Each structure stands twice: as C-alpha cells, then as structure tokens.
Amino acid sequence: WALFINWFNVPYNKKRDQAYLIRKEDLLFVKKDQKINKNFCSFVASNPSGKRLDFVPKLHSKKYVDCGGSLLNNTGKKIKGRGDQKWKIKYISNFRFNIAFENEIGHGYVTEKILHPMSVNSIPIYWGSDFVNEDFNSESFINATNYEDDEELIAEILDLETNKELYLEKLAE
C-alpha cells in the first residue's frame, strides 16, 4: 500500500479522503512497450506562491499546459484538491509530465506534489527541496533546480517530449 497523508491539517470532513490509500497493485509501473499517457503536461495548484507563477506561462508559450487547479486555470473546470486528492491523481494520469512545484524551497519540505505524478506514470517537473534526491531517485524526475535557467529546463522537457525513447528511459527509472 502507498498512503496519501493529509499534509494540510484539514479538519475531518466526511466528503474528503484525508488518508487516501493507493493499493500497491494499482500503482503503475512502466514497461518499455507500454502506451504512454495521452496529453503533454498538467499543472494543478491553488496557491499563487513560489516559482510556479513565472514558469508555467513560459512552458505554456512553447507547448500547451493544461492547468486544472484554481491557479492559472485554463480548462473551464477545477480539479478538487485539499483532501480530495484522488481526483487530482486521476486528472494527472492523463499527462506525460506534471509541473510539481512546491510553494517554496525549504530544507526537507517535500510534499505530495512529486509523489502523485510518479504514482500514475507522469514525470514530475519538480522545484522545491534540495533534499528531494535523498527520498527519490533523481533520474526519475526533472529537477528544475538543476538547470541554469527556465529556457534550459524547457529545452530538456521538450527534448524528452519529442524523443520517445529518452522519455521512456526516464519514466522507467
């Protein structure tokens, strides 16, 4: 089992899944010949903080990014969040990449943002804790802090997008 923990101290509410369990059997593990997710990139967030406000429009100007949260929404409907994480996970399972930017950089501050896309074969584009490599395989996601600037980061994303073999190698990590 993989356990989603309510990171937000949301009081108990029968309409929300505070601890959303994902059965190990339901986690997706990529195979080289597996069909890859249908759409390019998703972004789901509500907090207008951090680097996300700058980066998402830059990537979107190069290739369409579906923004399903309340922040920068361009889908016409908002994905539930803050406890209803199963809807977010289902949504991002349709995308090859997910922008997984934390609200801020903090030592050891790693939230569900990197784990959700990994659980549904979507490569996280992560910005956040400098300790993320201690908990996750650094080859399994794109760490935005490893790039000189956003243009270099976007070039890497678009390279993976156009090269199926490279994309599948990263996804298989």
Model-derived segments and their meaning:
Residues 68:
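Residues that scaffold, gate, or flank divalent-cation-dependent active/transport sites
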